[in-house]
């Protein structure tokens, strides 16, 4: 009799409740979300709820009647201990998605299920022993996935052919992937224990060869690196979208070292490299809605049958007007481009300033010594300018290089004290004395050379003078000789003239 009564109550419960996942529980008091919120506040609506409702009214402008509404969903429904990042994006995205599907593909819009109740979500969380992120809860309270895809011809998954999973399917698929992860972990532990006992890895290779009927499982990676745990399956990966071929888009509740809690990832049979495609569920939904609004879509209708539906929604980039693309490939390419841009920006920020690197730290005391040193050297060089200035300058250059080489390192300069300063000044004075002595020595060496040069020049002048005197004497003698000859000739002429006159008389 009790069993019959229970069955009757379950039947009545199924007719009177909106629960999709939650089963009838005679010990549970029925609760309603709005009534619970109003009772908790003595029948008064929370101010934040009023603000969100006013925002919803602004966002609903331009929407036609009959489009599913989520005005009764607000952030206050979610626990304050969890992050509400992505909740507002989820609400906004679903408004655009509902409006677009009702306008361009009513058959696709008809596949969207009614909302889940809080009881559904609570029971699912209890069965999976997890707490769904708030954007996921908000999404389930708008649409519980897609249904009746097989019965409705000409329709496909909402996300360019990929199906939005119902809460029942999410729980069932999560359990299936948990079994996969459990078996992988079990076989791995068995292989490690066997290798430890036998000291050989041949058994481990045989075990790996039988996993999932594959020769081996490749190394698991992620983009960005270390954002997702490097495993094939994980119990904390909750699938939300499926391609019905073993691949999923889901929420990651156990991210890697460089990941973020509740990030959205791709995983499954074809994803040895996992891709982080969004930081949260709301961000992913909003990016999909933006693609629809931007015109990155195409409806494939293979026949002219009126009853075949509006066609299958596929991705095609509007700007390039290129071919139809697989949505997984689009998400992977976008993630890779975003990762490369972030990598370049990080490299630019981490590049050191070369001008700062070339500057070497010099303490104040060392700078003072360096400032005083050139004046001392210049004074010495001026003093010996007329005697070996080039040699003195080379010595100064040598000493300046010596001073630079003996500069303390950054670690040593922190311990410079007055004693080291006095020692440095003493060494500099000693170097100045050496420079002065070197200059005097070179001046002394140069002085004999100057005297010798003057002596040689004097001898050369004396010899030249002697030669000039000899030439002058010779010239005078020749002149005198010529004068004597001329006088002798004149006398002979005079004598001949007188003889001629005597003869004439």
UniProtKB/Swiss-Prot annotation:
InterPro entries: Knr4/Smi1, Knr4/Smi1-like_dom, Knr4/Smi1-like_sf, KNR4/SMI1_regulator
Numbered residues of crosslink Glycyl lysine isopeptide (Lys-Gly) (interchain with G-Cter in ubiquitin): 453
Similarity comment: family membership: Belongs to the KNR4/SMI1 family.
MF GO annotations: DNA binding
Function according to Swiss-Prot or TrEMBL: Protein involved in the regulation of cell wall assembly and 1,3-beta-glucan synthesis, possibly through the transcriptional regulation of cell wall glucan and chitin synthesis.
Alphabetized PANTHER family for the sequence: CELL WALL ASSEMBLY REGULATOR SMI1
Disordered, as annotated region: 343-505
Main subcellular location: nucleus
Phosphothreonine: modified positions: 376
Cellular component, GO annotation: cellular bud neck; incipient cellular bud site; mating projection tip; nucleus
GO biological process, one term: cell wall organization
Compositional bias annotation for Polar residues: 343-358, 411-421
Entry-annotated residues carrying Phosphoserine: 202-203, 381, 394, 400
Assembly notes: Interacts with TYS1.
Protein name as catalogued: Cell wall assembly regulator SMI1
Keywords annotated in UniProt: Cell wall biogenesis/degradation, DNA-binding, Isopeptide bond, Nucleus, Phosphoprotein, Transcription, Transcription regulation, Ubl conjugation
Signal peptide: none
Annotated compartments: Nucleus
One Pfam match: SMI1_KNR4
SUPFAM superfamilies: SMI1/KNR4-like
